[in-house]
From Swiss-Prot:
The keyword Nucleotide-binding applies. Residues 347-554 form the MCM domain. Acts as a component of the mcm2-7 complex (mcm complex) which is the putative replicative helicase essential for 'once per cell cycle' DNA replication initiation and elongation in eukaryotic cells. The active ATPase sites in the mcm2-7 ring are formed through the interaction surfaces of two neighboring subunits such that a critical structure of a conserved arginine finger motif is provided in trans relative to the ATP-binding site of the Walker A box of the adjacent subunit. The six ATPase active sites, however, are likely to contribute differentially to the complex helicase activity. SMART domains: MCM. The keyword Transmembrane helix does not apply. GO terms for molecular function: ATP binding; ATP hydrolysis activity; DNA binding; DNA helicase activity; zinc ion binding. The lineage of its organism: Eukaryota, Metazoa, Chordata, Craniata, Vertebrata. This is Maternal DNA replication licensing factor mcm6. A motif (Arginine finger) lies at residues 529-532.
Length: 821
């Protein structure tokens, strides 16, 4: 096919039918016969009901399945494919004739045809001038959408010299006037005015798509192409959608380049030499027409569809989908597999191992990421406030602990996932940017990573390296799931219904156990509270673990595919995920009470001051507990949230919030250390013969043991404190007016530890240690409250020595303290 074919045909057609295109007329006749005769399996006409819909004023496009044309007439299908741009106007006339048979239609109404299910698909990178005018299908991700405008497709002009009317002047993607007045006497070529009442306009929208990461060659920059949508195809593709576009490649004038060329011509004409001659001179044939021949490729689409609409694309989380409709889209074998998975008693574990087969261990993170993919149930309150259902997860860990591997796995698995790096991304790149269009000079919105991941997952690596101003930009997106923009005269609120999976490194590169999580990560408190789950990965030296990891990595390098063991394939998991996400589980009465009880426990732990939380427990953690419980119910295809689902959600949340490594408890040493040393030395001297046999090295060796006695692990400290509190509570239950003093508590503890004490030195150290523990419980943790006996007596008996007052301390347990399990 010659490139000038379509343009020539159009031009001669408008110039008074001087040339008759027999090929197009034949295609029009065959296509009309196809519409009238094409029948389905039940014997009824496939396109009669669709044509009857065209009677409605808002409908003007008939969608035709291309495989039906191939089945009906292969030669017709080949001609449409190879000469699409040439025969398209005639196909539209055939649709108009077919629609008029169905009902009364206005004479001036235009109709269009769109082709779906075109078999072959081209990559954006493979588009070339050889494919201009042929029927193609391309796919990509929408990154920019322009507002809808009216486009002049056929103009009626009035000659300003002789008042003659020139009808149906086809517009070649720019404002095109008649070449000459049709009146033989009039020689006007330039002075025409457009009659808008008799001209034809159509809805027109431009969108820009770019290559997806899956199609992109390694290390290459994504290519983009502009898509032109008309009629009913407008507003069908939103920013972030992955769509298939069926249409043809066309050549359009580059308006911006033409405008720049005109400007250069105007300025260049004014520059003259010293004697009045043009200093530019004659450029020769090399530059001839360069300014005027500025064209670029664009794609004129007639049909827009979702990429893989069954198990991915933009239909992943459509609200109108139900479990029944998803089931109807599956084959019998696919449905049997989904049903088999739903009955699997070990489904939780099998999904985790199948989803991350190359990552050894880290089972808790696998469970958390899996629940993130299933997600909770989004809700809308009576006031119209939206409550998010998406789960946000953050992984904090030392280098080389497979953080980025989790993000890469999710990006490859999820049909709508965006991977980005925090340091290399700006606030506009993460949310949305307002840019100026090159042609219309209007401001349009270009989607950022969070908008592109709408109804999907946004994986952000190096999350802690983001600048503070960029972190603030995603506050709204993480909680309200919207992005508000007010700049350059554009005010908009855009959807960002995405789950965020972030990976961050600790401050200094290594996670310090002596500090809490909030001191280990360079993140603000508002950002941390918006994450539902935090996971900590510490690179520990463990012989068994190191051997298992090394064996796994060597296995992957040596045998590659053979070493990967999956219970379910990726396609099975995607299918099951799509089916399970259609469930909207409700919280039962038992689960509701259990959730309230677990949240009370979390708040109580946070308020007790003993357990070191990673951050403050707020209502957001309660909402996280609800979302995780709903996700567990969805995973098991349950319509109700049961207490067992809440239990697993609480376990994951507890690991994330409470289980923060705590440092050893160090007691103040100072002068107390000297007193301990004196008592130890006196005890050794009183032992007689043992003191005589002691050499000079032994006192030096005793010092470390003394120092070690004033320091203990947090677990030991918690064990002793729980033991003391339990004893006091039991004594209070037995005797209502129980007055336990510090001395009573010390003596009771030493009696309990009697079997472990062998020497007098150990007795003195144990006594000093328990006194320090009681002192800390009173003054720092406020678990115990001290009362002096003098406060219980009359004021006259209050004159006592400080030593007597110390001995007379009465201890009671703080009524607000709850003993941990």
């Amino acid at each position: 096919m010659e490139l000038g074919g379509p343009a020539t045909a159009g031009a001669t057609d408008t110039a008074g039918q001087l040339f008759k295109d027999e090929l197009s007329d034949k295609c029009q006749k065959l296509f009309l016969e196809f519409l009238e005769e094409c029948k389905g399996k039940d014997g009824s006409n496939l396109y009669v009901s669709a044509a009857e819909e065209l009677v409605r004023p808002e409908r003007n496009t008939l969608v035709v399945n291309f495989t039906d044309i191939e089945y009906y007439n292969q030669q017709l299908a080949t001609t449409i494919q190879e000469e699409y741009y040439r025969v398209y106007p005639h196909l539209c006339r055939a649709v108009r004739s077919f629609a008029r048979q169905m009902g009364n239609i206005p004479a001036n109404k235009e109709f269009y045809v769109a082709f779906s299910d075109f078999p072959a698909r081209q990559k954006i990178r493979e588009l070339s001038s050889a494919k201009i005018g042929t029927l193609l299908r391309i796919s990509g991700q929408v990154v920019r959408t322009h507002p809808v405008h009216p486009e002049l497709v056929s103009g009626t002009f009035l000659c300003m010299d002789c008042q003659s009317v020139v009808k149906d002047v086809e517009q070649q993607f720019r404002y095109t006037q008649p070449t000459i007045c049709k009146n033989p006497v009039c020689a006007n070529r330039r002075r025409f005015t457009l009659d808008t009442n008799k001209s034809r306009f159509v809805d027109f929208q431009k969108v820009r798509i770019q290559e997806t990461q899956a199609e992109l060659p390694r290390g290459a920059i994504p290519r983009s192409v502009e898509i032109i949508l008309r009629a009913e195809a407008v507003e069908t593709a939103m920013a972030g959608d992955r769509c298939d576009f069926t249409g043809t490649l066309i050549v359009v004038p580059d308006i911006s380049a033409l405008a720049a060329g005109d400007a250069r011509m105007e300025t260049g004409a004014k520059v003259t030499g010293g004697e009045g001659f043009n200093s530019e001179g004659v450029q020769g044939l090399k530059a001839l027409g360069v300014r005027d021949l500025s064209y670029r490729l664009a794609f004129l689409a007639c049909h827009v569809g979702a990429t893989n609409p069954r198990f991915g694309g933009k239909d992943l989380r459509e609200e109108d989908q139900t479990a029944e409709s998803i089931k109807n889209q599956m084959t019998v074998q696919e449905w049997e597999k989904v049903f088999e998975m739903s009955q699997d008693k070990n489904l939780y574990h099998n999904l985790c191992t199948s989803l991350f087969p190359t990552i050894h261990g880290n089972d808790e993170i696998k469970r958390g990421v899996l629940l993130m993919l299933f997600g909770g149930v989004p809700k809308t309150t009576m006031e119209g406030t939206s409550l998010r259902g998406d789960i946000n997860v953050c992984i904090v860990g030392d280098p080389s602990t497979s953080k980025s591997q989790f993000l890469k796995h999710v990006e490859e698995f999820s049909p709508r996932a965006v991977y980005t790096s925090g340091k290399a991304s700006s606030a506009a790149g993460l949310t949305a940017a307002v840019v100026k269009d090159e042609e219309s000079h209007e401001f349009v919105i270009e989607a950022g990573a969070l908008m592109l991941a709408d109804n999907g997952v946004c994986c952000i690596d190096e999350f802690d390296k983001m600048d503070l101003k960029d972190q603030v930009a995603i506050h709204e997106a993480m909680e309200q799931q919207t992005i508000s923009i007010t700049k350059a005269g554009v005010k908009a609120t855009l959807n960002a219904r995405t789950s965020i999976l972030a990976a961050a490194n600790p401050v200094g590169g290594r996670y310090e156990r002596s500090k809490s999580l909030k001191h280990n990560v360079n993140l603000s408190a508002p950002i941390m509270s918006r994450f539902d789950l935090f996971f900590i990965l510490v690179d520990e030296c463990n012989e068994v673990t190191d051997y298992a990891i090394a064996r796994r990595i060597v296995d992957l390098h040596a045998r590659n595919e053979e070493s990967i063991e999956r219970v379910y394939s990726i396609e099975d998991i995607q299918r099951y995920l799509l089916f399970a996400r259609q469930f909207q589980p409700k919280i039962t009465k038992e689960a509701e009470e259990f959730i309230v009880e677990q949240y009370r426990r979390l708040r109580q732990r946070d308020g007790s001051g003993v357990a070191k939380s990673s951050w403050r427990i707020t209502v957001r953690q309660l909402e996280s507990l609800i979302r995780l419980s709903e996700s567990m119910a969805r995973m098991h295809c349950s319509d109700e949230v049961q207490p067992k689902h809440v239990k697993e959600a609480f376990r994951l949340l507890s690991k994330s919030i409470i289980r923060v490594d705590t440092p050893d408890v160090s007691f103040d040493q100072g002068e107390d250390e000297k007193n301990v040393e004196e008592e130890v030395n006196n005890a050794n001297l009183n032992n007689g013969e043992e003191a005589m046999e002691t050499n000079q090295d032994e006192p030096i060796n005793d010092k470390p043991s003394t120092n070690a006695g004033l320091k203990m692990s947090f677990a030991e400290y918690k064990q002793i404190s729980n033991l003391l509190v339990l004893h006091m509570q039991k004594m209070e239950e037995v005797e209502e007016e129980c007055h336990l003093t510090t001395t009573d508590l010390v003596n009771w503890y030493l009696k309990e530890m009697e079997a472990e004490i062998e020497t007098e030195t150990e007795l003195i150290l144990k006594k000093r240690l328990i006194e320090k523990v009681i002192h800390r419980l009173i003054n720092y943790d406020h678990i115990l409250i001290e009362l002096n006996k003098s406060e219980l007596k009359t004021m006259d008996d209050s004159k006592e020595t400080s030593e007597d007052a110390a001995e007379d301390r009465i201890l009671v347990v703080n009524p607000n303290y709850m003993l941990e399990d």
